[in-house]
Every structure is written in C-alpha cells, then in structure tokens.
Amino acid sequence: MNTRGQGAVDPADKARALALTPVSRETLQRLELFVELLLLRQQRQNLIGPSTIPVIWTRHVADSLQLLDCAPAGAKIWADFGSGGGFPGLPIACALADTPGAMVHLVESVGKKANF
C-alpha cells in the first residue's frame, strides 16, 4: 500500500518479521488486518513515522511481539501506556486473542489517536 508517497510496505520485510517472531495462521490474519487498517488511517493521521512504513513488520510488529518472550510465563494482563498507533498493545492483543483470560489495556491521552 502506498500512503501519500511515503513508500509501500516491503513484502520481504514481512517475511523477515515472521521469521523473527513466528505466529499462528490466525494471529497472522489478525496482524494483517491491523496493519491494513493502520495504513489506511495513516493516510489521514500520522500514527507512525512515515519512513517506517516500508519496514512496518520488523520495526513495529515484530518489535512489539518480542515483548511476549520477555514477560513472565503465562502473563495474561497487559497495559500499553501511550498506545499511539497501537504499538505494542494491538500486536500483543492479536497474539493473545485465543488465550483464555488474556486482556490488553491500551491507554492513550491524545483523543484522535485513541479514536483510531
């Protein structure tokens, strides 16, 4: 997707990200939808740095998902303060969507970012 001439997502970047942080097919589908929605909104609102669009999968998605490996085993309740464009909270929520009892709370003080 090309957003205001800022560059398209590099397909090789997505492959690199998935090699770094493998996910289930269901999680991948949720992540793809999130990235698609983020890039659509990015056309009207600056949610991520425009220069990071080509590498959104490694720079933002994989970077967010690596937090799952740093958390205590079985951590189910997460909070993302200053969520902005949804990183790292929404990728973590995508990964934990099938985990019973998992909750991810996103907190954002800027109204237009919170509306996203």
Positions of the model-derived regions?
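Class I SAM-dependent transferase core
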Residues: 1-75, 112-113
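Conserved SAM/SAH cofactor-binding pocket of Class I
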Residues: 65-116
